[in-house]
Amino acid sequence: MKSEFTRAKAHATLTSGEVIRMLRELKGWTQQELSDRSGINATNISPLENERIDIGKKRAEQLAKAFDVHPAIIMFPEYEAAEMKRAA
């Protein structure tokens, strides 16, 4: 019997800014708290989350340390999505 359903395709890809916001919200932190924990100026947190400024290696490392994750998770969020797509 042929299935009536087709396999879903992955559509959601996250930007670095979306990953930063998601991690911050999962921790229950305000932007000021993230600033305090990462050492990144509070005025730069919103622009980072909204992709108005480039993250760069140094900021990615600071954020990764604050979130206790590998910097690649922040800098290359599309990599994991590509790996999952290839495995499907």
Where are these regions (language model features)?
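Short, charged recognition helix plus adjacent turn
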Residues: M1-A10, K65, M75-A88
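A short, Lys/Arg-rich alpha-helix, primarily the initiator
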Residues: K2-L26
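Short basic helix-loop element that most often maps to the first helix and adjoining turn
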Residues: E18-R37, Q62
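Residue-level recognition of specific faces of alpha-helices
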Residues: V19, N44-P47, I73
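Recognition helix of helix-turn-helix/homeodomain-like DNA-binding domains
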Residues: G39-I55
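Short, solvent-exposed alpha-helical "recognition" segments
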Residues: R52-K57, E83-K85
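DNA major-groove recognition helix of helix-turn-helix/homeodomain DNA-binding modules
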Residues: K58-I73
